[in-house]
């Protein structure tokens, strides 16, 4: 890792021995362990250990769960919030498990579209609800800092399964709950 940073500093014309940079390789290495710890965790385990048999058959919504991730194209952050709604069949999941699921997938190199899909598919596979919907809204620093330099652009993605995909009324109810 140190060789990588020494080469990086040299390539951009920086002095690797400058006081403020001496410990940077170590600090960044520790930061990267945290930012990409999702590779060392199994999202299925997070859900399997946190559900219980439930009697609720109405929509449950976890809204505005904050996240940040790293764009795999430019290695710059994208951040925002995710809302997940589901209609249970037999299993109800603890809300903290939804946040953990989001954290595990977001702590990997990502694109927003895949992040949204992975969360939806894993939730659908493990919890087996009658329907699940995930909406992700994020600001991408790669759009703000370089290229088109659009500071206020928000990207929205959604993935729907089951009743949310088949029934427009169910989908509309979820969207209305997000607005309220």
UniProtKB/Swiss-Prot annotation:
Pfam families: GTP_cyclohydroI. Disulfide bonds: none annotated. It catalyses: GTP + H2O = 7,8-dihydroneopterin 3'-triphosphate + formate + H(+). Zn(2+) binds at residues 71, 74, 142. One of its GO terms (cellular component) is cytoplasm. Pathway: Cofactor biosynthesis; 7,8-dihydroneopterin triphosphate biosynthesis; 7,8-dihydroneopterin triphosphate from GTP: step 1/1. It is an enzyme of class 3 (hydrolase). Keywords: GTP-binding, Hydrolase, Metal-binding, Nucleotide-binding, One-carbon metabolism, Zinc. PANTHER family: GTP CYCLOHYDROLASE 1, GTP CYCLOHYDROLASE I. Belongs to the GTP cyclohydrolase I family. Toroid-shaped homodecamer, composed of two pentamers of five dimers. This is GTP cyclohydrolase 1. The gene is folE.
